Amino acid sequence: MQSVMTRTATLRAPSGSMTDVFACARAQIYYNSKRKPLAQVKRETGCSHIINGYLFNGSFQPVGWTVIDGKVISRDAYQDWGISIGSDGKPQMLTDRGGSFLSGVPLLKNGAKLERSLTPDVARSAARTAVGWMPDGRICLWCDKTSLTREQLQNKLLGLGVADALMLDGGGSTQGFFPSGKVASSRKVPTMVLFWEETKQERNADLNWAGKSGILTEVQLAEPEKVVTRRELAEILHRLQK
């Protein structure tokens, strides 16, 4: 029921810290071979949110898996979770590398903490960028210059209600531009993750269809943000099968 969820306002902590929860219409893994700053890529693409991507080496080459529309830019021996984007454009935390894919350090899955072996430079307390998924499907972006360990970041994301999460590059690479603020860095990064927030028009189109097709009742349409019970979900799925 992602399409009927309303946007959560950006949560602004001290300067250099941004968190935003929103319904995502589509996302894109961006390979920054021309070393453009995030602000320029945001202007050129029209995305609503943009954050730095995953780790890279001294030659400005991504490490881990970077796949753009089926073309492998970089790879490693691991087949762990990452940001996976299929034909529908929706970002998910999966292992599927068939469409577009970007590696990340798995932090949470179904609300449980995940542990992975980290090199000292990644394990140390540092500024952090992360992508999370709420139980209702909305995206939670975390971009914070405050130094945090992995466990501290996990606890903060759990406190926001995040179910699944991946940690991206951090330290001096941490940067992001959101609709109501930014976390800036002068460092160029080879990969970025772009998001387009679902518009009110898109949400209303989904609701209008749901009402006309009888998937949602008038009562449910009056409060589309209300949590759907298991019984109501079963009724909706049953109607779809008819």
Model region roles, listed by residue range:
Residues 1-201:
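Gly/Ser/Thr/Pro-rich low-complexity, intrinsically disordered segments
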Residues 202-215, 219-242:
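Short, solvent-exposed alpha-helical surface patches in non-cytosolic proteins
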